[in-house]
Amino acid sequence: MPRDPRAWLWDIQQAAKRVSRFLDGHDLPSYQSSDLVRSAVERQFEIIGEALSQLAKHSPELAAAVPRWREIIGFRNMLIHGYATIDDTRVWRIAQIDLPPMAQAVDQLLGVP
């Protein structure tokens, strides 16, 4: 039985909320100095990227409504395959700049006010 595409949107929504929660109270230097927070945030971006990848395969019109979805999938691939060269500043920037509008779009797709 095929998965309901909204399930991938829900996965994205929940992972985005976790990123925001994990980063609450941190600035870039404190983020960079915490292995635990960095690992947690990176894992959530892996989930977001994989969910977007599956959404793009099974419901491309929904994926297209998520800002920068292709870039986030590429970012997920970099986290998975380029783990030895992750740029903490890039992760931080994506979390601070790119994630909020993406999360807002996903909320709208899910009908969350």
Regions found by a protein language model. Give the residues of each.
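Solvent-exposed interaction patches of small proteins and small membrane subunits
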Residues: 1-113
